[in-house]
Amino acid sequence: MGLTNKTAGIILAVIGLSPFSLLFAQQPNSINFAEHVAPIIYDNCVECHRPGSIAPMSLLDYETVRAWGPVIKDRVEKRSMPPYFIDKEVGVQSFEDDRSLSDQEIATIAAWVDSGSPQGDMNYLPPAPQFEDDVAWTLEDDMGRPPDLIIPIPEPFTVPADGPNWWMTFYSDTGLTEDRWIKAFETKPSAEGYPVVHHAVTSMEFPDGGGGFLSEYALGKTADINPPGTGQLIKAGTRLNWNVHYAASPDGLDRTDRTRLALWFLPEGEDPEHELIRSHMADNEDLDLPGGEERIRTDGYEYLDKNIRITAFQPHLHNLGTRQCIEVIYQDNRRQTLSCADWDFGWHIAYNYSEEVQPLIPKGSMIHVTSWFNNSKSNPWAGDSRNWVGFGQRSTDDMSFSWISYYELTDDEYDEAVAERHAGFEIGSDD
């Protein structure tokens, strides 16, 4: 029988050691960049903190990391970097692609900075990660191949440095001659356009008049892979409807963008068990955010007329948002919090539940989304905090809803999934 986390915690408590003290007991005064800190930085930070990417500085070399050491320590201890803001004390705690640092990794960085940021023996430095140029797709490694289809907006669009917010609608033909199921997708502004693309939402227009939502890109978001057994149908002859929000570049330069959508398909002839749906839920367009108020709560609700299995949730707020929670209200009035996450407008993060804990929600339930806002001087993004703010499309307006990824279950499928979940818990309790 393996040593569980719970058992390990009990043992540590009995002998009077914490994971942090074990760290220092094993490595007294020896934590250095080459052996201990560089692997953490390379694995978790340099995807963004490298030349030509979106971060303000590169962290590929010792000298730069040492210079920024106190700031890095502050950010990782606050868990504002790497950006992954799920509340570790509330709700579901198992996620795919969790980019947050472990407590031990944070302790290692803090101890290194506090000890003077020693370099160590550079012979032990791991090779620095190699990256393709800015037009590469981040999903190529995960999918094992380039995209099957790339669809750009029809023409480049230039955003003037002194211009207002722009909400543009574009139409792109896909050129598809047969129906296909989408496994994964990635939306990518052009390299020059990154600073001015706030969001890019695509919807499908089928030749027969149907269609629906396809994808959403926003600041800090990269790509989506549909869970196993699911996919999104795109039909032959589909036209894409783009809704792109541009804002003037903060560097005072004119910027030209040509955003593109990359699609990876399931193998021809392979149909998924379920069609994945991405939809925003519990919208609250009656926002009332008075100036000077530091903690403002809003609530939104969504009734479910079908059984669903939730695979991911992604909060959506604007500059004044600070936190969002999602809970289920069952027909018998029981309430269950699924997840809470802090909010940073620069990072639109989809939190993908691990398959074994994806919430199973019976029809007749209500999704309840609670959001909090700060319209006071303590919020650096508040602008003039004397001003009232309400719902709207501009970044200086605000919003409150959750993007929910899910698929529908028949009554039999729901009952079977619940039975499997209960059986799994019983097996786990015997370990």
What function would you assign to each model-found segment?
Residues A8-G9, N29, T64, K73, ...:
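Generic detector of ordered secondary-structure context
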Residues A136-D412, H422-D431:
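His-enriched metal-coordination microenvironments in redox/metal-binding proteins
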Residues L23-S172, S190-A191, H198, G237-N243:
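Aromatic- and Gly/Pro-enriched helix-to-coil junctions and flexible linker segments
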Residues G9-S21:
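Bacterial N-terminal signal peptides
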Residues M1-I11:
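Bacterial N-terminal signal peptides that target proteins for export
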Residues I11-L12, N32, E140, D283:
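Residue-level detector of alpha-helical transmembrane segments in integral membrane proteins
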Residues N5, D87, G91, S215-E216, ...:
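Short alpha-helical "patches" and their helix-cap loops
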